[in-house]
């Protein structure tokens, strides 16, 4: 593998994981805060809010996992090498 391609792959993998985790991390924090606020205002809706929150958090976490998969492909199964 060319050293330039290897260096670019490592940098791209780092960016995929780093930038892929920023958005979902902020979104998960905001969603959790809003869920706590909603439960505090309306305790009888706790079950519905919690279920919706867990589903939403799973969808947000999948974006981070996609970034990790792209990084692993770039590092170990690089199509450009």
Curated annotation (Swiss-Prot):
One of its GO terms (biological process) is proton motive force-driven ATP synthesis. SUPFAM superfamilies: F1F0 ATP synthase subunit C. Pfam families: ATP-synt_C. It is found in: Cellular thylakoid membrane. Keywords: ATP synthesis, CF(0), Hydrogen ion transport, Ion transport, Lipid-binding, Membrane, Thylakoid, Transmembrane, Transmembrane helix, Transport. One of its GO terms (cellular component) is plasma membrane-derived thylakoid membrane. The record marks 61 as: Reversibly protonated during proton transport. Signal peptide: none annotated. It is a multi-pass membrane protein. Belongs to the ATPase C chain family. F-type ATPases have 2 components, F(1) - the catalytic core - and F(0) - the membrane proton channel. F(1) has five subunits: alpha(3), beta(3), gamma(1), delta(1), epsilon(1). F(0) has four main subunits: a(1), b(1), b'(1) and c(10-14). The alpha and beta chains form an alternating ring which encloses part of the gamma chain. F(1) is attached to F(0) by a central stalk formed by the gamma and epsilon chains, while a peripheral stalk is formed by the delta, b and b' chains. PANTHER family: ATP SYNTHASE LIPID-BINDING PROTEIN, MITOCHONDRIAL, ATPASE PROTEIN 9. This is ATP synthase subunit c. It comes from Synechocystis sp. (strain ATCC 27184 / PCC 6803 / Kazusa). The gene is atpE.
